[in-house]
Amino acid sequence: MSLTGLFLCTFLVVHLVGNLQLFKHDHGTAFNTYSHFMGTNPIIRTIEWGLVLGFGFHIFEAFSLSRRNKAARSHGYVSNHSEQNSEWTSRNMGILGSIILIFLIVHLYNFFWRARFAGDLSHMGGENLETRDYDNLYLAVVSSFHIWWYVLLYVAAQISLGYHLWHGFRSGFQTLGLNHRKYTPLIKYVGYGFAVLVSAGFAAMPLYFFLFTNAQGEMAANVPALIHAVASAF
């Protein structure tokens, strides 16, 4: 489980960096170009299968571990004071993972499935694209980020992801035997930083579009100057 988890951490970094194209003020050209490349490049398409297997195996391992832990508790002491012997995140990894899984299903259907198989994004415009035959996935993202319940689900999933990474990053290295008095504190703080940066980066996207842009992704006129300056920096 540690290997698949650390592998998926690499995917999260790549996915986050790519999605930062959403903040470019080019009417979605950069993001649509990036999405088109990721969906058509044969090397990326091959790597996708490894990613699918990685997610599938990680989820399978999580359910298996949850069942084993439940069985162990049922044969153990009635009161083992688990709240004193373990962190909150480790006791609730199943709940956090379930929230992430629900979000992942909705997220994949809303974007990946529609773009790759349903073919219902081409009607969403394209006048602002340099290459007209691309699906305008940018407008699909902006449209989704103006739906309040989807924004809430997205942000809740990123909070869950942050806690999940917070615990999993350090535990992954420990499981691999990389546990040393000198390096473990460093791994711990790197894991904290990684969890916060990744989850905050993803959560900022729906919040930005929901709070500060119109239905076309253009920044509203009443946006504070500081936020406008930060977004324009991308």
Name what the model sees in each region:
Residues 1-234:
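Membrane-embedded alpha-helical bundles that constitute the cytochrome b-like, heme-associated redox core
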